[in-house]
Amino acid sequence: MSSLLPPHAQILVVGGGPAGSYCASILAREGFSVVVLEATTFPRYHIGESMLPSVRPFLKFSGADNKIASHGFCPKPGAAVKFQQHKREGYTDFSTLSSGNSPDNAAAWNVKRSEFDEILLRHAEELGAQVFENHRVINLIFADNNVSEGRPISAEFSCPNGELRSISFDYLVDASGRAGIMSTKYLKNRKFNNTLRNVASWGYWTGAKRYMPGSERDNAPFFEALTDGSGWAWFIPLHDSTVSVGIVTDQASSTARKALSARNGMHCSSKADYLAQLKLAPTVSGKFLCKATLQGENSPTCIRSASDFSYAADRYSGDHFRLIGDASAFIDPFFSSGVHLALLGALTAAASISASIRKTCSELRAAQFHDKKVAIAYTRFLLVVMGVYKQIRNQDLHILAEVDEDNFDRAFDILRPVIQGTADVGKTVSEDELQKTMDFCKDIFAPTDPQMHEAVGARLGPELCSPSVPIMTDSEIEDLTKDDNEAKLVLKEINARKAVHTMYGGPIHVAAESIDGLVLNLEVGNFGLKNVH
């Protein structure tokens, strides 16, 4: 922790989680003055242990990847997803993105967030950010007292001794997590997704069996739909030999379940409810946990729980401020997208602030760049997750009111001709198009495996199984595969991944997509935004 808190910061970052620490790292490396105010003292507990492969290239850009790789976190070779009990699970293989299934070479990891997050925060300090823990921001002050359209200029915060102080700043980055001080207290623009109002409960187990131990899939997380269609379970191995096991169900089902227990004169504890729901994931409970022990099972706090409501906002930036991480938006954790979205938003916030300071573009254009990048990334993952829930609940999810039309256009522009069957697509997004997009995206989790991919490639030719082949329509896949159902599954999975897997490239992918004539400039020392030539 830094020793002396200055009265003014060029850039104030509120929150030291992955979003805040990553943004602070990049800006400090560029030579800007950065102060981070973190409400808690690290290390601190946090859920969200499963990472996407994109996290590694993001961390490589900030220089933190070797610290994470050498820490000993559990390598994540892929992920298994089981939607239906009478069908095999699907498996996403990350091996092609890594140089080996060891922590140092892994494409992704399962992490303990208390350790992962602290490494990133200390890295920000090493690069020059001034970090102050146990300093909680309480209020923001705006120029001309204009909250709705004004510019935040200072923050009031509490110190460890309880003293209230203030700090002024030129730029504000709100990385305050779900509390989201800008969005909830001042902009008042947080909008919850009515379809994804879920609750989560979880605990940690010892002595659990693993998914395919001794194989190339060893340590892969396993995700399983509950048999009653109310949600899903996660099973995530960690490097301390424990396993994180959680249940996500929709709030309505959870409330009804507890009300029924109350009417029957039964008090349903968090632990009893968790164990009862776990039985609805027979592979996780019956196969992996059959001889396992719940950590602290005699403690009333052995089961943790949290609301799992997905939300977004109508904007994530403004005059000299940016919103990132959970302070900006949050989406259901099925796709393990939390840290990915945090780092992506942190990157674009840092780039837009750098561009504004260096005057390579106006503050307005810079803010809008960040705003649209966050919205596009959120929309992509939203449609993937909604496609998953459409399968889990076995029903159409009418989400037209949940999706911003402009964000959909930007996020899925390459899919619209494929989905609608013509290059001359309409400009207005329809409910039918959203349903087809969700159906397209759900094939990301088709029940295939690497051996099936290899066999289909041998039959149809490896070029058809290449991710570089243009996205195909359903009719094109039908013509190619005929009655070969295995090939149909493989091609549909590959097809769906083309719209999502480019994001695994981290900063390079973010830099490749232009917004209103601007792209990221990833050159260290000149980091920011530049015009597309």
From Swiss-Prot:
Chloride binds at residues 337-338. GO terms for molecular function: flavin-dependent halogenase activity; monooxygenase activity. FAD binds at residues 16, 19, 49, 339. Keywords: FAD, Flavoprotein, Monooxygenase, Oxidoreductase. InterPro entries: FAD/NAD-bd_sf (IPR036188), Flavin-dep_Halogenase_NPB (IPR050816), Flavin_halogenase (IPR006905). It catalyses: melleolide F + FADH2 + chloride + O2 = 6'-chloromelleolide F + FAD + 2 H2O + H(+); melleolide F + bromide + FADH2 + O2 = 6'-bromomelleolide F + FAD + 2 H2O. It is an enzyme of class 1 (oxidoreductase). Melleolide sesquiterpene aryl esters are cytotoxic secondary products with anti-cancer potential. Armillaridin shows therapeutic and radiosensitizing effects on human esophageal cancer cells. Armillaridin induces autophagy-associated cell death in human chronic myelogenous leukemia as well as of hepatocellular carcinoma cells. Armillaridin can also inhibit the differentiation and activation of human macrophages and thus might have potential to be developed as a biological response modifier for inflammatory diseases. It comes from the Eukaryota. GO terms for biological process: secondary metabolite biosynthetic process. Its EC number is 1.14.19.-. Flavin-dependent halogenase involved in the biosynthesis of melleolides, a range of antifungal and phytotoxic polyketide derivatives composed of an orsellinic acid (OA) moiety esterified to various sesquiterpene alcohols. The halogenase catalyzes the transfer of a single chlorine atom to the melleolide backbone, resulting in a 6'-chloromelleolide product. The enzyme acts on free substrate and does not depend on carrier-protein-dependent acceptor molecules. Can also catalyze the transfer of a single bromine atom to the melleolide backbone in vitro. Armillaria species are both devastating forest pathogens and some of the largest and oldest terrestrial organisms on Earth. They forage for hosts and achieve immense colony sizes via rhizomorphs, root-like multicellular structures of clonal dispersal. Belongs to the flavin-dependent halogenase family. This is Flavin-dependent halogenase armH4. It comes from Armillaria mellea (Honey mushroom). The gene is armH4.
